[in-house]
């Protein structure tokens, strides 16, 4: 069985305790999407991906979050890819997986 395990880093925390999922301005931006696909039958790692996501100049990375993940705007400028590309790639790998 192929298992996809993923993790994200963001620009901060949501604005407010329980903001609506439709109020996107209150949610942080994803700035890193990392995942592995593990084959439990062969005990092999099928793939290991680590994508930094580029963000617009007006998006603020909260200092508290940057202390946790150590992702700077400079790093995103040099290594970041558009979120659409990262999500398309993630979607392709999720199609290869039996479990998320």
Where are the predicted features?
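Conserved non-catalytic scaffold segment of RNase H-like nuclease domains
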Residues: 2-100
């Amino acid at each position: 069985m192929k298992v996809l395990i993923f993790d994200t880093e963001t620009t901060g925390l949501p604005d407010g305790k329980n903001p609506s999922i439709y109020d996107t301005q209150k949610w942080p931006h994803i700035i890193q999407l990392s995942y592995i696909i593990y084959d439990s039958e062969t005990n092999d790692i099928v793939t290991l991906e680590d994508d930094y996501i580029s963000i617009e100049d007006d998006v603020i990375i909260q200092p508290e979050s940057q202390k946790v993940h150590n992702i700077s705007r400079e790093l995103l400028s040099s290594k970041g890819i558009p979120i659409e590309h990262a999500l398309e790639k993630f979607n392709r790998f999720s199609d290869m997986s039996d479990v998320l």
